[in-house]
């Protein structure tokens, strides 16, 4: 599942040719530098983060402690985590996918064979149609519908409602998933990536602007690490599937949901939750790539994407390194396993958990908010080897949860990585926090833990500027913009040709007239001189 938006930041480069038409109108065409236009960002308030830990969530109507927001999200392996919301008057209960990789709040508004219920806007007395069509394509799937507004309540926040923008989905393709149990998507990103444009206020912005809830939320997703069920793993239309749980804390943190110290990565920009990755290690060995490659063209934290996705070159490097660690113990792993096209199923003679022992830990180093430092997320094999069930052969199998990014989508720290940690989206202070999760560890019960992973290290010094690892999107190449530039250049050339012809004609005519004038004068002088020579000499 991959529901983050596929687009990079929109950066429009207007070459000098594009302004030539204006130059013609003012009779002068001058060579000009290219100009870069970006959408300005909205800056949040600077507040003390410590005040939010364990504090009651203050709203217009009720006080809700973050400790009361435990186990309020559910999910299915590979199908995402969802939270219950009430929409409209009278309230209609729906489950919505929690997605930090997009910014639209959208729910099904018509029947679909993959969902059991949908939003009936005509039955809500508080629904307001905005008269705007919206379409959102994802890397996987898309939906379209009508933009409107209605009252929304989050069940775990108590009797608290606010007005939110809602897209009523009327058409979709590869979006709703069988057995997922959710009927919509809750985009928690920033306004800059909202569709159809940034004027659509996102859900969390509406929540914090209409209440006194602080601009922060946290996710604890207890998926792979808490899973102990040996059968019916993953999704299937053939029968019941395993359900996983978690917590979404809105307005503060619950200190009982994490161990140790929280480490923070600064938000590079406010669109996706973009951070900077400084290195990747397999076991104890660095991939040794230029750090810019890890972040081409961005690195985001996205709960709506299942896998760890990496730029193609990085994916190839990490896959080769993992293969080198596992080949000695597991030489028969099918090649299609590494591309996600096939499952790896242990033989009858091996423990269903044995592969965890032969696969290495992964370490993702992230830029720290401490100047000149980074910190590490140590990822267990139990996170990136997703358990699945082969219903045909009745076997417990594994799926490789690392995949290459498509269409320059960059690196995506998806759900399989987030499931090992308590992840804080501190929008007020423009940072993302990570701490070790208190989710019950299934590996401890089954004896499949590898080292102490997953874990998070203290911040450590680095001898380079981590900001230099970020990808410079101002140089991004956009074929559509390039074609537009060429078209404008052609129009400019067509407009300039008459001007050039006119200028040349004018200069030629001017010179010709000058030459004719000088020719008459010179001829007259010659005639006068000739007459003087022919006159008789009057001197004696």
Curated annotation (Swiss-Prot):
Record-annotated membrane-spanning stretches: 483-503
Any single Pfam family the record assigns to this protein: Asp
Signal peptide extent: 1-31
EC number(s) reported in the record: 3.4.23.-
Chief site of localization: membrane
Catalytic center residues: 99, 302
Cysteines engaged in disulfide bonds, as pairs: 222-439, 291-469, 345-397
Topology relative to the membrane: Single-pass type I membrane protein
Highest taxon in the source lineage: Eukaryota
Gene3D superfamilies documented for this protein: Acid Proteases
SUPFAM superfamilies: Acid proteases
Domain Peptidase A1: 81-435
Subcellular location(s) per record: Membrane
Principal EC category: hydrolase
Intervals, Cytoplasmic compartment: 504-540
Gene Ontology BP term (one): amyloid-beta metabolic process
GO MF assignments: aspartic-type endopeptidase activity
Keyword line: Aspartyl protease, Disulfide bond, Hydrolase, Membrane, Protease, Signal, Transmembrane, Transmembrane helix, Zymogen
A GO cellular-component term linked to this record: trans-Golgi network
Entry's family note: Belongs to the peptidase A1 family.
Annotated protein name in UniProt: Beta-secretase
Organism: Strongylocentrotus purpuratus (Purple sea urchin)
Gene from which the chain derives: BACE
């Amino acid at each position: 599942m991959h529901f983050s938006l596929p687009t990079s930041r929109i950066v429009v480069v207007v070459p000098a040719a594009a302004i030539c038409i204006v130059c013609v109108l003012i009779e002068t065409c001058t060579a000009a530098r290219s100009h870069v236009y970006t959408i300005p960002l909205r800056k949040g308030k600077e507040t003390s983060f410590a005040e939010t830990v364990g504090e009651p969530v203050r709203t217009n109507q009720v006080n809700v402690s973050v400790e009361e927001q435990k186990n309020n999200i559910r999910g299915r392996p590979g199908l995402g985590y969802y939270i219950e919301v009430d929409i409209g008057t009278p309230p209609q209960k729906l489950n919505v996918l929690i997605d930090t990789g997009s910014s639209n709040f959208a729910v099904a508004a018509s029947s679909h064979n993959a969902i059991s219920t949908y939003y009936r806007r005509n039955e809500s007395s508080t629904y307001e149609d905005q008269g705007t069509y919206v379409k959102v394509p994802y890397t996987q799937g898309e939906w379209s519908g009508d933009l409107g507004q209605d009252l929304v309540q989050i069940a775990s926040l108590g009797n608290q409602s606010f007005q939110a923008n809602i897209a009523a989905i009327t058409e979709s393709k590869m979006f709703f998933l069988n057995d997922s149990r959710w009927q919509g998507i809750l985009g928690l990103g920033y306004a800059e990536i909202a569709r159809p444009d940034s004027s659509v206020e996102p859900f969390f912005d509406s929540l914090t602007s209409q209440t006194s809830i602080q601009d922060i939320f946290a996710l604890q997703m207890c998926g792979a690490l808490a899973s102990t069920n040996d059968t019916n793993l993953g999704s299937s239309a053939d029968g019941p599937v395993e359900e996983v749980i978690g917590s979404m804390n809105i307005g503060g943190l619950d200190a009982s949901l994490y161990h140790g110290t929280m480490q923070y990565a600064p938000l590079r920009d406010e669109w996706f939750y973009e951070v900077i990755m400084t290195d990747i290690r397999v076991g104890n060995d660095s991939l040794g790539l230029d750090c810019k490659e890890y972040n081409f063209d961005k690195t985001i934290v996205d709960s709506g994407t299942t896998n760890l996705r990496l730029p193609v070159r990085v994916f190839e490097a990490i896959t080769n390194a993992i293969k080198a660690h596992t080949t000695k113990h597991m030489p028969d792993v099918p090649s299609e396993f590494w591309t996600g096209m096939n499952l790896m199923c242990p033989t009858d003679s091996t423990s269903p958990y044995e592969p965890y022992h032969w696969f290495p830990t992964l370490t993702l180093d992230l830029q720290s908010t401490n100047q000149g430092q980074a910190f590490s997320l140590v990822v267990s094999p139990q996170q990136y080897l997703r358990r699945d069930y082969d219903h045909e052969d009745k076997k417990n199998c594994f799926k490789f949860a690392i995949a290459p990014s498509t269409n320059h989508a960059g690196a995506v720290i998806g759900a399989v990585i987030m499931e090992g940690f308590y992840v804080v989206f501190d929008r007020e202070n423009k940072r993302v926090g990570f701490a070790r999760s208190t989710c019950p560890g299934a590996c401890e019960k089954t004896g499949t833990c590898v080292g102490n992973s997953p874990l998070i290290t203290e911040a450590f010094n680095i001898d380079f500027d981590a900001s230099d690892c970020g990808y410079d999107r101002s140089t991004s190449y956009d074929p559509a913009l390039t074609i537009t530039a060429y078209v404008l250049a052609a129009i400019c050339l067509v407009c300039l040709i008459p001007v050039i012809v006119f200028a040349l004609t004018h200069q030629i005519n001017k010179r010709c007239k000058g030459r004719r004038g000088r020719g008459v004068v010179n001829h007259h002088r010659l005639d006068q001189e000739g007459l003087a020579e022919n006159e008789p000499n009057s001197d004696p």
